[in-house]
A protein has these predicted regions:
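Aromatic-rich peripheral "rim/lid" segments of glycoside hydrolase catalytic domains that contact
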Residues: 255-305
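Short aromatic/hydrophobic "clamp" motif used to bind/position activated sugar donors
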Residues: 386
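Short, flexible, basic/aromatic active-site loop/helix in glycosyltransferases
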Residues: 417-418, 432-450, 465
Length: 909
């Protein structure tokens, strides 16, 4: 990490992934705040030039490279900064502490002043970035509403960018208003003051997800020496800065340089945040900050102890991109790394290009697919950690530095990071990057991932070997999902490193995008065969949150914000609302096919003779209905809903920074961008469905990885199973108990129980609770309408004996509730029609028979599930040397809200 040199030929600073780049070099912000100062006779709120020069010289000696101001500095201050090798984060002051949006004239002046200031200072070599606002008070945000504030700041950003397109802009937020959606800005900046290291690091991890693919800047950090003491100030300020750098921020700014502080019309004398006092005498905090800045982001002594990493690149016909990939790997700053290229039977020049890099080990392997190639690299790796990336990826120089951090500081078996499309990719690839279906991460919380993409992941070598590496059945995709789920099934966790970013070249044509989605669809089918508990009705069930900037996914991920009583919470609570798959229904192939069928039927209806009268069911009176017109309207509604949503997502896609297409300008190119993005939204689910069908044709070669050594046939239910099922269906439960003269480990028994259930034939869909529910350990699906939840307990008794207890409860899913209501309506409608034609007796008989058949099928499925669980529990307990105790029914428990709320989640996973 380097500071910017004194500029001769000025090049505008730019965003470089999760960091900043100045003069074509990585620039890690090591800053201090400067001001605000008392205004002089001319209203300038900066010290005299001699004092400014003295301050800047002391800053440079303390390894500071950035000065943050809260008022617009005179050009002389910027000149002094560049003379001392400093950059300036320029703050634009305006009256944000009053309801400014209530005064249109004030809003106009704010915009004009901001645009004029940035246009005037943008070309100065000292200008690093511009802060267009700082901590709009929560009361003002509540007064105007968050959406109006967001819209104002977004429009202000766009106006300034139009006037100075190369300038970097940020808005400095703070925790009370963290819920503001300000992803348009180039840098995500936050002022944060937390005095416990664990709390600060946890909050920085959260802020990294708010920042997304943008750099995160800790814009203020430090503490008051009056209240914490001089040594306390030094310790806490150093902790703040160290945490920011090691958590992957693009920099940190210490608040403040001096105790000289003027605010609200007068000096502030009861706070002392300065690294130096008013007379510029250094405090202990200055030496602490100097040491942190000199070692940032990680001390050399710490880096020397990091483990060796083997980077494996699997390549097939990658001659177009492999050189760029290996060149970027050669620039890694990680201290101990080896690079292995597995040439997976390429027919082009991939192997020879890779051999042109002398520090790269190339292994030629017969074409066996992606997973097989990953296993070849795993076998050849000598590092303690094995990192994987793709041949069409360009890595950041500090990629490995941050990717290994979760494995160094937390109990995780692996880690992954984000991937973004390079800015220099062609326009078709830029559109593909804004379409659904691309690789992204799924987070269980701010640090633990459920899935990380295969182009950016690393694992401990021994963890991969413990599960026999990658499953070679995954030829092109799905291997990353499979490996994460298999590690989690063993109780291991996968971390996330937000600063370990790679640039991933996306498909450069619609045809290539289609082939990719078909491949993903195949992999989904095979994943369903391997991990049936992770699917419901053919749909993949994620417990975590899919992090993506795409409007397609963000539109479905609602949230609720609790800002505390009267908006006074220092750290608001933000809750993600549940996303149900019904929200994606208009994008499903079934919806599209049904809409087309209805549309075609409506158009051709007259030719097919669809002119018979329909019945008004509520009265039984005949009512003439134009059937073709009704079908046409239904088909048009379905098609326009799908097309409208695709167009909406394309319209809401972020096109900032994209170049013009050919000879077209940026403005002229936007319709073409949006049209193609909308088309990709339309074809993506169709491609996945095509892949699902192809995967089914190969499913016989996909054996479940959860089969134990002793498969067993599910039993024929007995009378006692029917009685137990009856108790379950009427709201009760069942319980079994087993006695052991020795201590029994509950986790061991549960692991065996899951294995036995998954070994049953026919196969059972078993969902293992991963910490989200306290009232169940595992669940067995009952058809598609319900769950049989099983909870276990091991009681410790005298002399090392123990009692193993299991109990089961039946709960219908949300989907079952909807289906039941639908069936009831259909039966009622059918009965009405039947009565009109055949009379009451026959109609009632048919209705009763139909309802009885449905109920009997549900009862049979419940009985069979009870029998399977009962026998499986008995097998596990007997194998552990336990003796069964007499059967006893569990007490009835009323759960009035579970079907409507909690089971909405269960129906998804």
């Amino acid at each position: 990490m380097t500071s910017g040199p004194r500029a001769v030929d000025h090049k505008a600073p730019r965003v470089d992934g999760k960091f900043l780049n100045v003069e074509n070099r990585r620039f890690l912000v090591k800053g201090v705040t400067y001001g605000t100062f008392a205004p002089d006779g001319d209203g300038i709120q900066f010290p005299p030039p001699a004092r400014v020069a003295q301050d800047f010289a002391l800053m440079a000696a303390a390894s500071v490279n950035t000065v943050r101001t809260y008022t617009v500095p005179p050009v002389g201050v910027l000149d002094a900064a560049i003379e001392h090798g400093l950059r300036v984060m320029v703050g634009l002051e305006w009256p944000q502490h009053i309801p400014f949006l209530d005064d249109p004239e004030l809003v106009r002046r704010i915009r004009q002043g901001a645009v004029a200031t940035v246009r005037r200072l943008a070309s100065h070599p000292a200008a690093l970035l511009f802060a267009v606002g700082n901590e709009i008070p929560p009361g003002i945000v509540r007064w105007h509403g968050a959406r109006r504030i967001e819209r104002f700041l977004r429009e202000l950003y766009e106006e300034i960018k139009t006037a100075a397109p190369d300038s970097l802009l940020t808005y400095v937020n703070f925790p009370p208003t963290e819920y503001l959606d300000l992803d348009c800005f180039d840098v995500c900046s936050f002022n944060v003051y937390l005095h416990r290291d664990a709390d600060l690091r946890a909050y920085l991890a959260r802020l990294q997800h708010i920042a997304g693919h943008k750099p995160l800047l800790l814009a203020e950090a430090g503490c008051d020496s009056v209240r914490e003491g001089l040594d306390g100030q030094a310790r806490i300020t150093a902790m703040h800065l160290r945490a920011a750098f090691t958590e992957g921020a693009c920099g940190a700014v210490a608040y403040s340089w001096t105790d000289e502080w003027w605010r609200g019309g007068g000096p502030v004398n009861d706070w002392a945040f300065g690294l130096v006092d008013e007379a510029r005498n250094p405090k202990p905090a200055l030496a602490a900050v100097r040491n942190i800045f000199a070692d940032a982001p990680f001390p050399a002594s710490e880096r020397a102890g990091w483990p060796k990493v083997s980077v494996v690149v699997c390549a097939y016909n990658a001659a177009d991109t492999i050189d760029d990939c290996l060149t970027s790997l050669a620039s890694l700053t990680y201290p101990s790394v080896e690079v292995i290229v597995v040439n997976d039977g390429s027919r082009d020049a991939t192997g020879s290009i890779a051999r042109g890099h002398p520090d790269v080990r190339v292994i030629d392997a017969p074409k066996g697919g992606l997973s097989a190639a990953r296993n070849v690299g795993l076998a050849a790796a000598t590092g303690e950690i094995v990192a994987y990336t793709d041949a069409d990826v360009r890595v950041d120089a500090d990629w490995l530095t941050y990717l290994v951090q979760p494995m160094l500081v937390a109990d995780v078996a692996g880690a992954g990071g984000p991937n973004v499309v390079p800015h220099d990719d062609p326009w078709l690839a830029q559109c593909v990057a804004r379409a659904p279906g691309g690789p992204t991460h799924v987070m269980l919380d701010d640090r633990i991932a459920e899935h990380v993409p295969g182009c950016n992941m690393a694992f401990r070598r021994d963890a991969l070997l413990s599960i026999d590496g990658f499953n070679p059945v995954y030829l092109r995709a799905g291997d990353d999902v499979d490996i994460c789920w298999r590690l989690q099934a063993k109780g291991l966790r996968v971390g996330f490193a937000p600063a370990a970013l790679v640039w991933h070249h996306h498909r450069g044509s619609v045809r290539a995008f289609w082939r990719q989605q078909v491949g993903y669809g195949e992999a989904e089918t095979w994943l369903d065969a391997h991990h049936s508990e992770k699917f419901l009705g053919g749909q993949m069930l994620w417990h975590g949150r899919i992090y993506s900037p795409l409007p397609f996914l963000r539109s479905a991920a609602g949230r609720r914000v609790n800002t505390g009583v009267w908006g006074t919470a220092a750290f608001p609570s933000i809750y993600s609302t549940q996303t149900h798959r019904w929200q994606f229904l208009p994008h499903s192939p079934l919806w599209m096919a049904a809409s087309l069928v209805l549309l075609i039927a409506g158009i051709t209806g007259e030719l097919m003779g669809m002119d018979a009268p329909w019945l008004l069911l509520s009265t039984g009176e005949t009512m003439e209905v134009n059937a073709p017109l009704l079908l046409l309207a239904a088909g048009l509604l379905g098609c326009t809903t799908t097309l409208g949503r695709c167009a909406t997502f394309a319209w809401r896609s972020d096109l900032s920074g994209l170049p013009g297409i050919g000879r077209w300008s940026r403005a002229q190119s936007r319709p073409a961008y949006r049209a193609l993005i909308a088309w990709l939204h339309l074809v993506q689910p169709v491609g996945r469905f095509r892949g699902n069908l192809r995967g089914l044709s190969l499913s016989q070669g996909v054996a479940s990885q959860h089969v134990t050594r002793h498969p067993w046939k599910t039993p024929v239910p007995a009378f006692r199973d029917a009685r137990a099922a009856a108790r379950l269906l009427t709201g009760g439960g069942t319980e079994r108990s087993f006695w052991s003269e020795s201590h029994a480990f509950r986790t061991t028994l549960l692991t065996e129980l899951v294995g036995v259930l998954r070994a049953a034939r026919p196969a059972q869909v078993v969902h293992v609770d991963e910490g989200w529910r306290q009232d169940r350990d595992l669940s067995l699906t009952i058809g598609r309408w319900g769950w049989l939840h099983v909870q276990t307990l091991v009681e410790d008794h005298e002399k090392g004996s123990s009692l193993f207890r299991t109990r089961a409860r039946l709960r219908p899913s949300f989907l079952a509730t909807v289906q039941a209501l639908t069936v009831a309506l259909l039966v009622a409608a059918g009965t009405s029609v039947s009565i009109a034609f055949h009379g009451h007796s026959a109609s009632m008989f048919v209705s009763i028979v139909g309802i009885t058949a449905i109920a009997a099928r549900a009862a049979w499925q419940a009985t069979r599930a009870v029998a399977v669980v009962d026998r499986a529990v008995a097998r596990v307990a007997t194998a552990a040397g336990m003796l069964p105790l007499p059967l006893a029914p569990a007490p009835r428990v009323s759960h009035p809200a579970e079907t409507t709320l909690s089971e909405t989640t269960l129906s998804r996973g």
